[in-house]
Amino acid sequence: MLIKGEATVAQHTGSHYLLSTLPQWDLFPAVLRGKIRLKGSNATNPVAVGDVVVFEAEVAENVQDAPMAEMVTAENPAVITSIKPRNNYIIRKSTNLSRQSHIIAANVDRAFLVITIDYPQVKLPFLDRLLVTCEVYNV
């Protein structure tokens, strides 16, 4: 049986994602449908932590009332079919010399900056860059 729903990206590693349906926070695995990855984007990865996504999952008939974490497994992950519009995001330039960017997090409500007083020394330009990024992207 095919089920569809919305979930929030809680973690991503390479092409593997962990999604969560709020408010339960049941984490379940997902992969990205190929055509989404190919859309014209200058980001290194089209999906970021915090994105709200639409997914489809093929589950057995006898487990349809179980939590998502029990219905969807790593052997049979959900498929992310689309990404909902973002409210905001935090971005940085990619580490290579290309013109790509890396979206660190999406739909961020608050940003907390925790730094050390003495060691390791915090560089003030890094602090400035983070604060300006949060202001520019409405975090």
Where are these regions (language model features)?
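N-terminal accessory targeting/assembly segments
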Residues: M1-L124, E135
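Charged helix-capping and loop-helix junction motifs
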Residues: P125-L131
